[in-house]
Amino acid sequence: VAAWIGTSGWSYDHWHPELYPPGLPARDRLVRYAQSFTTAELNSSFYRWPAPAAFAGWRRRLPDGFRLSVKAPRGLTHARKLHEPEAWLERIRAGWHELDGRRAVLLVQLAPAQARDDTRLDYFLARVPDWIRVAVEFRHPSWHCEEVFALLAARRAAYCVMSGAGLPCVLRPTADFVYVRMHGPDREHLYAGSYPDADLRWWADRIREWEQAGQDVFIYFNNDGEANAVRNARTLRTLLSE
């Protein structure tokens, strides 16, 4: 049982000098990031799924004990809306295999306009290999119900807990791990603002409760502006160590 705290993405120019020293080449950012954090969520994979060689490269560059979560491609989640996922799952398997001991969770974020469809979700989850941990982030309100939670639990997939403007914050674990995305405390805009320490202390208490229940926790800050994600992740880690 462990808590993995990191950020959504790592290659941001505006994270100088909070995390990266001046003049650090973009290609060296991940190695520098891994000196400060033990996990990250790869978001660029949503726009273009990487080749297996890219996953192998990350595996070689990342230290033992580091875990990389990866966002599923929009070709699967937004274009096909999980319909006939087999071809995409083959590509995902190939990359996931290369990541080997560095792999954490495959994040499947559904489109905001995609309403509840239990049959399609179940068909997809049934075809994900058992060795790939999956978390599903629902953006349409119709998904947030007991029947969907039960479906996720039956397939050992995690309901993605969300914190952000206009998003319901439902603390409902459905797997042996919990996946949390922190999209920022701003009430009007996603990915904006910095979480106050009081809020982070509340989240630290929730993480302890999940750990006591025997669940691993993966929590990623997505409020990257002004390096807020970096500072918030560090603060949460400090609060957990108290």
Segment roles from a protein language model:
Residues 1-242:
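Residues lining hydrophobic/aromatic ligand-binding pockets adjacent to catalytic sites
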